Swiss-Prot record:
PANTHER family: SULFITE REDUCTASE [NADPH] SUBUNIT BETA, SULFITE REDUCTASE [NADPH] SUBUNIT BETA-RELATED. GO terms for biological process: cysteine biosynthetic process; hydrogen sulfide biosynthetic process; sulfate assimilation. Keywords: 4Fe-4S, Amino-acid biosynthesis, Cysteine biosynthesis, Heme, Iron, Iron-sulfur, Metal-binding, NADP, Oxidoreductase. InterPro entries: CysI, NiRdtase/SiRdtase_haem-b_fer, Nit/Sulf_reduc_fer-like_dom_sf, NO2/SO3_Rdtase_4Fe4S_dom, NO2/SO3_Rdtase_4Fe4S_prot, NO2/SO3_Rdtase_4Fe4S_sf, NO2/SO3_Rdtase_FeS/sirohaem_BS. It comes from Methylocella silvestris (strain DSM 15510 / CIP 108128 / LMG 27833 / NCIMB 13906 / BL2). [4Fe-4S] cluster binds at residues 443, 449, 488, 492. GO terms for molecular function: 4 iron, 4 sulfur cluster binding; heme binding; metal ion binding; NADP binding; sulfite reductase (ferredoxin) activity; sulfite reductase (NADPH) activity. This is Sulfite reductase [NADPH] hemoprotein beta-component.
Length: 578
């Protein structure tokens, strides 16, 4: 493709002097490649946080967030105490794969430092919550013992790379997982600072550039990559900054269709921000995946907005400069024009629960984990049960993009043992849920997330129970409907592609959306703004009743809400706020 434009507007990107860019750009430059004064801040005994003006932001590049218990915030303020600080630690786990030995170490660290809780994320990794400052190094060094790190799990870098589950179901899945791992290793920052701060390694003087690809300013914002194998769009490939859709012939991987420009984040009352689904721009042979990654990430590095962070994601770079220009720039860096995209089809973006047998004769069990929270509760000992399984398991574990866990690669001879442990701990009944609940997803939100305006993980199960009653009354209990909730509009649970979605506005108040595509192919549209539970249930009740009466055979709920006129179809991200 030839670039026919006179030239791009470079007034907001990395070509400009530092003083013309946003404050985070200067912060990154002065951080000495993300070292800052984190070490000194960790030693400051006066506060439970990390002192130093830049360190809270810099620690995100290390996979660590400063948080506080918002349930206690007002009371501690009244007592003139600082917030009850703790830390979130997010792991880098390409493709969501962990060995049994790694699982046992995660369990040990969760019990020692993470409030006996493991949280599976919407990007196939784990988070520890409630880690105290004095336990940060012990936790990260414990992860290092089993070859896991937290590098680039947050920050203005390529985040954790996703891949369809289950890699071991076929040789195709294995190839795609291997590519996801290679992309992750290739695209991550070098980050010698991480090794010095968390592992105590000495700084080594060198004349070589410390970050030859990313440079001192890294990327304008986070950058998300995922690899998917049709027909299951479990990673929601259209929501990724860069997506690779695997194309196979005769069961063998030949290459990938490239998708660019997806992203969920937006801000209420800021119509210039919006979710966007990625565009399929062409096909590459499988051998070109690392070169394509460099070309796309490099384009965003050089042309992304570094003046206004709310406008810095790749989706806005594309809409600012135009898809034709961005594709032309990618092709210029590759040195060739992309081939036309190959045909593919998606049928859902959910998980298939229960037992499955791979072509190699090994078994896999997908276990429903409501909102990804692995803890022991009165009704089920999830943490204990999965630890018992990991202690004998001869295969691996896979975290799914829908926050569930696959006990994978089980030899046929070991299947009865794993099945017996599932029964012993009551895990064999976890999948016996409504299709609505099995297709539900929530972010963490309160009490730990500093951005949350309303409940999400703690509230969605209750709301789902009430909607289940409505659906059962109308004979819709066997209809698979996706429902997602977030505590703010940033979209961590990818709500804007769900058939029913709620994003928090204030305590007990949400925006209600309908019309997302069942396999993640279409954005939804706001139906009600800033409403409480009664209004939400009334709306669902009315539309579900109409759906039960007038739906076409095989018509999904999201499709019906558009056909029946409840919401308009959103054909492009810029239409989302219209």
């Amino acid at each position: 493709m030839t670039n026919t434009l006179a030239g791009p507007d470079r007034s907001r990107d990395i070509s400009q002097p530092l003083e013309k860019l946003g404050p985070d750009e200067a912060m990154k430059v002065r951080s000495d490649y993300l070292r800052g004064t984190i070490n000194e801040g960790l030693l400051d005994a006066i506060t439970g946080a990390v002192s130093g003006d830049d360190n809270a932001k810099l620690m995100k590049f290390h996979g660590v967030y400063v948080q506080d218990d918002r349930d206690l915030r007002d009371e501690r303020r009244r007592q003139k105490l600082e917030p009850a600080y703790s830390f979130l630690i997010r792991l880098r786990l390409p493709g969501g794969v962990a060995t049994a030995a790694q699982w046992l170490k995660l369990d040990e660290l969760a019990r020692a430092y993470g409030n006996s809780s493991l949280r599976v994320t919407t990007r196939q990794t784990f988070q520890f919550h409630w880690v105290l400052k004095n336990d940060l190094k012990a936790t990260i060094q414990g992860l290092h013992e089993v070859l896991i790190d937290t590098i680039a799990a947050c920050g203005d870098v390529v985040r954790g790379v996703m891949a369809s589950v289950n890699p071991s179901l076929s040789s195709l899945h294995a190839e795609v997982y291997d590519d996801a791992r290679r992309v992750s290793e290739h695209a991550m920052p070098n980050m010698r600072a991480y090794h010095e701060i968390w592992y105590g390694e000495e700084r080594v003087a060198t004349s070589e550039p410390e970050e030859p690809f990313l440079g001192k300013q890294y990327l304008p914002r986070k950058f998300k990559i995922g690899l998917v194998i049709p027909p299951y769009n479990d990673i929601d490939v259209y929501t990724q900054d860069l997506g690779f859709i695997a194309i196979a012939e005769n069961g063998r991987l030949i290459g990938y269709n490239i998708v660019i420009g997806g992203g969920m984040g937006r801000t209420d009352q800021a119509p210039e921000t919006y979710p966007r689904l990625g565009d399929v721009i062409g096909f590459i042979p499988k051998e070109q995946i690392l070169a394509a990654t460099d070309a796309v990430v490099g384009t965003q590095r050089d042309f992304g907005d570094r003046t206004v962070r709310a406008h810095a994601r790749f989706k806005y770079t594309i809409d600012t400069h135009g898809l034709d220009f961005i594709q032309g720039e990618i092709e210029r860096r590759l040195g060739y024009a992309l081939e036309p995209a190959r045909p593919f089809e998606f049928v859902s973006n959910g998980d298939a629960y229960g037992w499955a047998k791979g072509e190699n004769g090994r078994y896999h069990y997908t276990l429903f984990i409501e909102n990804g929270r692995i803890v022991n509760r009165e009704d089920v000992a999830l943490l204990d049960g999965l630890r018992a399984i990991a202690a004998v398991h001869q295969g691996s574990f896979r975290m799914t993009p829908n926050q569930n866990v696959v006990i994978a690669d089980i030899p046929a001879k070991q299947k009865p043992k794993i099945a017996a442990l599932l029964r012993e701990y009551g895990l064999d009944h976890r999948n016996e849920q409504s299709l609505l609940r099995l297709n539900s997803m929530a972010c963490v939100a309160l009490p730990t997330c500093g951005l949350a305006m309303a409940e999400s993980e703690r509230y969605l199960p209750t709301l789902v129970t009430k909607i289940e009653t409505i659906l059962a009354e109308k004979g819709l209990e066997k209809e698979p409907i996706t429902i997602r909730m977030t505590g703010c509009p940033n979209g961590c649970a990818r709500p804007y592609v769900a058939e029913i979605a709620l994003t928090g506005r204030a305590p007990g108040k949400y925006n209600l959306y309908f019309g997302g595509g069942f396999h993640g192919q279409r954005l939804n549209k706001m139906y009600l703004e800033n409403v409480g539970e009664d209004a939400i249930l009334q709306a669902v009740d009315a539309i579900a009743g109409h759906y039960a009466q007038d739906k076409n055979p095989g018509e999904h709920f999201g499709d019906f809400t558009i056909r029946a006129g409840y919401v308009k179809e959103v054909r492009a991200g810029r239409e989302f706020n219209d």
